Amino acid sequence: MLALPAVQANLNNIVLGWFNIGQMFSKTKDTSLIAALSTAEQDLPGIENDLFTSTQSFVNSVLWSGSGKIDDLFTSQTVYVNQRLATLYPGITYSGGTKAPTSDTTFVAGTWPPSQGRSGMLTQPSYLWSASDPAVNSIVKRGKGVHDNVLCQDPLGSPVDLSTPSAKLVLACTNPTVAGATPDSTCDSEILISNARMTYQPCKTCHSQMDPYSRVLQNFGPIGNYRTVDEKGRSIDPTVTFVPSSPLAGTTLTGVQNFTQALVSSGIIDGCSVQQMASYAIGSAIQKYSTCEIDAVRTSTDGTIKSLFSNVLLANFVRARAGGTK
């Protein structure tokens, strides 16, 4: 069954759903971010369709033409581009007789520039585009997406009421526990506001868990473009230290490549893939990472898509049925 193209395509779409790639189609972008394209090519829906095709091709190449390992979705340096995407994301190289694309209808495999430090799905432009605002990155959207969906960490609880005086002060980069305190910074960038969220309650409890996952991605802008300075022209430092209860608790890392390598070593990616596939199989999101049923499947898989799919389908909680006509 796994050799059937339709089955492979369905599993590819499950993976795209794991990363919420479909959210890309509800996003708008500041047109200044696509100024490298000719006026005729500056078609946001067209670019989004290109990015979706690119990511489908990437996932398919890893899972069915490559190693088949889930971990490689996070570490591969491959990207698929047509002429428009190659223009929008410059520096991609081609090898093995592959030439740069010359049309928007043909996608070819290329390799990201090593200097950009990209790493698999987390730096595919479609993923970054999906989890960003029109003109700036969203540390909250990216961080929550990685925490909840990519790493399958247990829910953090309900969001705080941002209309409260203490929350307003935090969002103004001001210590809410000190009467008459002045702002800690100019508070005019995503990073500076994130600093305050991770420092002061009532925001700290959740954002100290979420924001670090996004801050390692700060070198990649709202459309997945590589950059070395942020929206205010300040140098980017993608170094973070992960707090207790994170799978990487106590670890200090710089950049997304070191981040994904640490995730691979921890086993959390394979673990989350089981949870995501099982959620799809039973038609209901499994919110808790560690359960007896899911943990049993985790011990049986070898990290490949074929093993993952087979072991989830054979799990007792998937095969068991109650009620209905036999």
Where are these regions (language model features)?
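Gly/Ser/Thr-rich helix-start
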Residues: 284
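Active-site substrate-binding loop specific to GH73 endo-beta-N-acetylglucosaminidase modules
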Residues: 1-281, 291-326
